[in-house]
Amino acid sequence: MRFSLLALLGTIVATSVSALKEPPTQLQVGVKKRIPASECTRKSHSGDELSMHYTGTLFDTGEKFDSSLDRNEPFVFTLGAGQVIQGWDQGLLGMCVGEKRRLVIPPHLGYGERGAGGVIPGGATLVFEVELLEIKPGKYNQKAMPVQQQQESPISFTSPSFLVSTGIIVALFLIVFKMAKKQDIAEANEKAAAATAEASTEKKEEKKE
C-alpha cells in the first residue's frame, strides 16, 4: 500500500515537472519589478520610442543568446512599428519607466520556424528579462501625454473629425427642414383642395334652388 502511494506521488511530481517545462502557446507577461502609481507618470504606448535593457534565453535549455547588458548599451526602438518581434510589441505595452518584466514568447510571436542568426533555432520559445529605461512619446501619440496635459489640450475646431461631424449635422438639419417644408406644402394643398370642393358643392346646391 505504501509503495502504491509513493508510486502515485512520484507520477504526480513527474507530471507536474513535465507540465512546467511545457512551452506556452500564448504570450506570458510577468511583472518582476512594479512601479508605484504615484511614481509612474507615463506608460508606454504604440508609437513611443523606448530605451531598454534585456537578456534573452531559450525556454527549453535556458541558454542565453543575446543581452544588451553584455554590451552595456540599451536597445532603442519604436514600439508597435514592427521593428521588433510581435511578442515585444504586445508584451511591452503599458509599461512604466523602471519597471521590469519577464516575457515568455511562443514561436509565432517570435522568430517562427525559421529562427534567427544561427543562435535561435526554428520553433523556439523565447524568454526575455526586460527593463524599461526611458520613454520618448511618439509625435502624434496623444495617449502618451500626462493626464493633466491631456485634459488641458484644447479642442481643435479645424480638425478633420470635427469638420466631418459638423457637416453631417448640417446635412441632417437641411434634410429634416426640407421634409418638414414639403409636408407643410402638402397639407396646405390638401386644405385648398378641400375648400375648393366645398365651394363647388355650395354653388351646385344654389343653382338647384
From Swiss-Prot:
The cellular component terms of Gene Ontology attached to this UniProt record, alphabetical and capped at eight, are: endoplasmic reticulum; membrane
Any Pfam family from its record, for instance, is FKBP_C
**Signal sequence interval, chain numbering:** 1-19
Where does the sequence pass through the membrane?
157-177
**EC primary class:** isomerase
| GO terms for MF | peptidyl-prolyl cis-trans isomerase activity
Q: Might you give the EC number(s) for this enzyme? A: 5.2.1.8
Regulation of its activity:
Inhibited by both FK506 and rapamycin.
For biological process, the GO terms are: chaperone-mediated protein folding
Q: Which stretches does the entry tag as region Disordered? A: 190-209
Coiled-coil annotation reads 178-207
Its keywords, alphabetically, are: Coiled coil, Isomerase, Membrane, Rotamase, Signal, Transmembrane, Transmembrane helix
In which broad location class does this protein mainly occur, judging by the first location in its UniProt entry?
Answer: membrane
Among Gene3D superfamilies, the record links this protein to: 3.10.50.40
- Membrane topology term: Single-pass membrane protein
The reaction(s) annotated as catalysed by this protein in its Swiss-Prot or TrEMBL entry are: [protein]-peptidylproline (omega=180) = [protein]-peptidylproline (omega=0)
> Which InterPro entries does the UniProt record give?
FKBP2/11, PPIase_dom_sf, PPIase_FKBP_dom
Start and end of every PPIase FKBP-type domain?
Answer: 47-136
Role of this protein? PPIases accelerate the folding of proteins. It catalyzes the cis-trans isomerization of proline imidic peptide bonds in oligopeptides.
Please state which protein family the record places this protein in: Belongs to the FKBP-type PPIase family. FKBP2 subfamily.
Q: What is this protein called?
A: FK506-binding protein 2B
Species of the source: Rhizopus delemar (strain RA 99-880 / ATCC MYA-4621 / FGSC 9543 / NRRL 43880)
The record's gene field reads FKBP3
